[in-house]
C-alpha cells in the first residue's frame, strides 16, 4: 500500500533570519549552504519525514495558521475517502523561537502572567488575557477501513466528517459566522446531528475576543444541548 504524508506547519523563521544575517555579514550568498533553503520552507517537515520514513505517496504541507494540523487531517480524510491513497501520515509541527515569537507578540495575543506560566492560559475564563506560546508536533495516521481490516489493525477511531470556512472579514480577529459554517459543514458531511456530539475540542486561545466569539459559535450550533468543551 502507498503511504503519503500531509502535515501542517505555520512558519519556519529561524533559518530565514540566520541566512539573511550570514549574507549581510559575509557579503556572499554561496556561504549560506544548500541546506538553508530547505530549512526555510514550510514544507521542510513533510519533506524530511517522507525521506526518513521512506514514504512514496502524496507529500505536501498545509499552512493555515492555527488550523494547519486540523486541515492536514481533513485533507487526508478526503484523499482516502476518494480512493486516492490507502494510508496517510497526518499531523502538525511548529518550532518555537524568540525570533518568531517576538513578532507574534505584536498582536498582543500572549498572556502577561510571566510569573505563573502553568496557569497563565485560562480559556473561556473571565480573567483570561492571552495564550502561552509553545512548540511541538503531533501525528494521526489515517487509513482506509479496507486497508486496516486487511492487515488486522486495531481500529480505535473513525473520521466521519470534515468542515472548513474562512471568516473573510479580518486577518487576525475571528468572527462568529466562520466557525459556525465550518462546524455545520463538518456535521453535514458526517451526517450527524449536533445533539449527538458528546465532546468538542475547542480552539480556546484564551484571548478575550477569540474565546468570546468561539463560545458564541459553539452555542449557536449546539443550541439544543450543552456539549462538554
What are these regions (language model features)?
Residues 1-64, 93-101, 194-212:
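Conserved beta-ketoacyl condensing-enzyme motif
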Residues 29-30, 38, 42, 53-56, ...:
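Solvent-exposed alpha-helices and their adjacent loops that cap or buttress functional pockets
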Residues 42-45, 50-53, 58-93, 131-153:
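Active-site-proximal alpha-helical scaffold in enzymes
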Residues 84-129, 162-176, 202-212, 226-229:
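Acyl-CoA/ACP chain-elongation machinery
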Amino acid at each position: 500500500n502507498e503511504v503519503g504524508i500531509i502535515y501542517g506547519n505555520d512558519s519556519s523563521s529561524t533559518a530565514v533570519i540566520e541566512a539573511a544575517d550570514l549574507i549581510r555579514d559575509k557579503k556572499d550568498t554561496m556561504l549560506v549552504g544548500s541546506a538553508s533553503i530547505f530549512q526555510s520552507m514550510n514544507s521542510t517537515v513533510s519533506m524530511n519525514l517522507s525521506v526518513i520514513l521512506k514514504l512514496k505517496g502524496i507529500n505536501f504541507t498545509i499552512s493555515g495558521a492555527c488550523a494547519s494540523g486540523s486541515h492536514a487531517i481533513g485533507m487526508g480524510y478526503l484523499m482516502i475517502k476518494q480512493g486516492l491513497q490507502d494510508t496517510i501520515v497526518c499531523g502538525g509541527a511548529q518550532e518555537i523561537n524568540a525570533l518568531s515569537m517576538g513578532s507574534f507578540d505584536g498582536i498582543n495575543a500572549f498572556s502577561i502572567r510571566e510569573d505563573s506560566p502553568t496557569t497563565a492560559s485560562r480559556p473561556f475564563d473571565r480573567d483570561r488575557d492571552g495564550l502561552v506560546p509553545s512548540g511541538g508536533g503531533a501525528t494521526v495516521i489515517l487509513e482506509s477501513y479496507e486497508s486496516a481490516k486487511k492487515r488486522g489493525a486495531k481500529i480505535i477511531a473513525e473520521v466521519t466528517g470534515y468542515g472548513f470556512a474562512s471568516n473573510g472579514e479580518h486577518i487576525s480577529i475571528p468572527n462568529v459566522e466562520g466557525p459556525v459554517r465550518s462546524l455545520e459543514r463538518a456535521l453535514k458531511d458526517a451526517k450527524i446531528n449536533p445533539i449527538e456530539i458528546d465532546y468538542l475540542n475547542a480552539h480556546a486561545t484564551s484571548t478575550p475576543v477569540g474565546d468570546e466569539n468561539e463560545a458564541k459559535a459553539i452555542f449557536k450550533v449546539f443550541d439544543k444541548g450543552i456539549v462538554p468543551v
